[in-house]
Curated annotation (Swiss-Prot):
Keywords noted in UniProt: ATP-binding, Chaperone, Nucleotide-binding, Phosphoprotein, Stress response
Modified residues (Phosphothreonine): T196
Gene this protein is translated from: dnaK2
CDD domains: ASKHA_NBD_HSP70_DnaK-like
Its biological purpose: Acts as a chaperone.
Induction: By stress conditions e.g. heat shock.
An annotated Gene Ontology molecular function: ATP binding
Residue span of region Disordered: 600-633
Biased composition (Acidic residues): 624-633
Descriptive protein name: Chaperone protein dnaK2
Cited Pfam families: HSP70
Matching HAMAP family: DnaK
Protein family: Belongs to the heat shock protein 70 family.
Taxon lineage: Bacteria, Bacillati, Actinomycetota, Actinomycetes, Kitasatosporales
Top-level taxon: Bacteria
Length: 633
């Protein structure tokens, strides 16, 4: 049976875990790390890099390195102006107003980028587990709307995964924490990740994890803290040197990396040094950035971000009807919860309670997702997960107001119906506009979709009865139907168009991802083969130098010719069909020279044989890279 895994698809880093041996465990990637950077890069040579390899080259390739794709997934271009300004790559408007990433004249959907991260996670885990990973539970922020959830599911499909379930990150964390808890506890999960903030109140105990409320801010995360530090450093430098480093993509990328490092260090020390030599240059020569950042300064420039966490916590507690004294445990999730000011805020909001430090904030979400995968596959018994919908859902009714059909924090799956009528005499059709949000005015909420119910029999206004049904499945994805009670005619919509991709686009991306996997594998094989050839050529040259005149003339001439051919093949980026025979010939020559050297050094100790195999530039194929106008009746 194929392995089902849990995946925490994060803004900054992602984690994959599996249920095995009666417990969930994180599966390391091919580099041996338990977290994988959610970064994808496209190089000048056409190579696609994912994870740590992509992150390492970001400074030299700021326009071709895509990070924080999660902040754009399932969103339209007119929604992401702030996020687009905060990255070094180009975010443009695609078909239908969708957000797209532009790299070397090609457009990529956020779903495609996320799919590359998911594919690497699944491929690496397959190698570690010894069997193919094809099914996954993927987590999303609790405050993700329907479009973002559908887009995440699309990303999984593009990656070649069957997405068993989409679950909320705080819920997954509580599942991992509370699975073995026998006593009933009320738990607050405070989840501040790279790009999103969620808070959930849950009841945990005796195999049941029930979400009572959730709230959040899908535009707040660690990236925002980094940006404040970048602006602080850049403003200081501009004041001193008259140069705005934010206008240079390469300098900006270096600033972001330095800011992230400084933020991390300031969680454990009270001051840190930022040193970026040769950050830029002007007519007077090169410029260096050196600055000392105090924790107190960092807290001052990010204080409003910390305070933005206050509202969602208070909202969640009010919705769940709990006070400070009712909270038994506080679980911190996400790397940004290590910031001391954030931890101080949590203590302040929970009556001074210290957070539970027994869970790893970077891994707990993936572990919970793996448990849910085990539940869905029948491997985990006696565990019940009761999640909620984070935002209210309804329709636009007469006067341009939103009439809610499903209130926020309703346990899912759920099915609710309301009956509406026409607003005009002899009205032949009604337009159903499906909305998500908490505002009274329809225009202030997000439109998830719209459809029309036609052929309503002529009748005075208020007489026809139209039943509108909202059905949310366990993934939090919505189906809406409208039925004319008189004629029985029905029309409906699955809110999957709320994704920025239609079905044909998803299919195209699936096929392209599969093609690219083969191309990327071939590219990686060619690079590794050339690296191996270069290494063997170097060893032959070294051996010739060591032998000097002791090398037989005919072997020396052949070796020098082959080395010259090897250097040309590497320089010309030759394919494996040319490179591998050359490597084989050079290895034979090297073996022959080694024999001569052995004879020449027989009376002076053994010859030192250098390794000849293996690529010199890391990694194998593991990184291949990848309106209605109704009146209520």
């Amino acid at each position: 049976m194929a392995k089902a895994v849990g995946i925490d698809l994060g803004t900054t880093n992602s984690v994959i875990a599996v249920w095995e041996g009666g417990e969930p465990s994180v599966v390391p990637n091919s580099e041996g790390n338990r977290t994988t950077p959610s970064v994808v890069a496209f190089t000048d040579t056409g190579e696609r890099l994912v994870g740590q390899l992509a992150r390492r080259q970001a400074i030299l390739n700021p326009k071709g390195t895509i990070y924080s794709a999660k902040r754009f997934i399932g969103r339209h271009f007119d929604e992401i102006s702030d996020e687009a300004r905060a990255v070094t790559y180009d975010v443009v408007e695609g078909d239908g107003g969708a957000a797209r990433f532009k790299v070397r004249d090609k457009l990529y959907a956020p779903e495609e980028i996320s799919a590359q991260v998911l594919r690497k996670l699944a491929d690496d885990a397959s190698k570690q587990l010894g069997e193919r990973v094809t099914e996954a539970v993927i987590t999303v922020p609790a405050y993700f709307n329907d479009a973002q959830r559908t887009a995440t599911k699309d990303a999984g499909r593009i990656a070649g995964l069957e997405v068993l379930r989409i679950i909320n990150e705080p819920t997954a964390a509580a599942l991992a924490y509370g699975m073995d808890k026998k006593e009933h506890e009320t738990v607050l999960v405070f989840d501040l990740g790279g790009g999103t903030f969620d808070v959930s109140i849950l009841d945990v105990g005796d195999g049941v994890v029930e979400v009572r409320s959730t709230a959040g801010d899908s535009h707040l995360g660690g990236d925002d803290f980094d940006r404040r530090l970048v602006d602080y450093l850049a403003d200081d430098f501009q004041q001193e040197n008259g140069i705005d480093l934010r206008k240079d993509p390469q300098a900006l990328q270096r600033l972001f990396e330095a800011a992230e490092k400084a933020k991390t260090e300031l969680s454990s020390v009270t001051q840190t040094q930022v040193s970026l030599p040769f950050i830029t240059a002007d007519a007077s020569g090169p410029k260096h950035l050196t600055d000392t950042v105090m924790r107190s300064t960092f807290e001052q420039i990010t204080s409003d971000l910390v305070e933005r966490c206050l509202g969602p916590v208070q909202q969640a507690m009010a919705d769940a009807k709990v006070g400070e004294s009712d909270i038994d445990e506080v679980i911190l999730v996400g790397g940004s919860t290590r910031i001391p000011a954030v931890q101080a805020l949590v203590r302040r909001l929970t009556g001074g309670k210290d957070p539970n430090m027994s869970v790893n904030p970077d891994e707990v979400v993936a572990l919970g997702a793996a448990i849910q995968a085990g539940v869905l596959k029948g491997e985990v018994k006696d565990v019940l997960l009761l999640d909620v919908t984070p935002l209210s859902l309804g329709v636009e009714t007469r006067g341009g107001v939103m009439t809610k059909i499903i209130e926020r924090n309703t346990t899912i799956p759920v099915r609710r119906s309301e009956t509406f009528s026409t607003a005009e005499d002899n009205q032949p059709a009604v337009d159903v506009v499906v909305l998500q949000g908490e505002r009274e005015r329809a225009a202030d909420n997000r439109v998830l979709g719209r459809f029309q119910l036609t052929d309503i029999r002529p009748a005075p206004r208020g007489e026809p009865q139209v039943e509108v049904t909202f059905d949310i499945d366990a993934n939090g994805i919505l189906n809406v139907t409208a039925r004319d009670k008189d004629t029985g005619k029905e029309q409906g919509i699955t809110i999957s168009e709320s994704s920025n991709l239609d079905r044909s686009e998803v299919e195209r991306m699936v096929q392209e991802a599969e093609r690219n996997q083969g191309q990327d594998q071939a590219l990686r094989e060619a690079v590794d083969a050339r690296n191996e050839l270069d290494a063997v050529a170097y060893q032959v040259e070294k051996r010739l130098a060591e032998l000097g005149d002791a090398a037989p003339a005919h072997e020396k001439a052949r070796a020098e010719m082959l080395v010259s051919d090897a250097r040309a093949a590497v320089k010309e980026e030759a394919g494996v069909e040319r490179v591998r025979p050359l490597t084989s010939e050079l290895q034979q020559v090297l073996a022959g020279l080694a024999a001569h050297q052995g004879a020449a050094t027989a009376d002076g100790g053994p010859a030192q044989h250098a390794a000849t195999g293996g690529p010199t530039s890391g990694g194998g194929g593991g990184d291949d890279v990848i309106d209605a106008e109704f009146d209520k009746g």
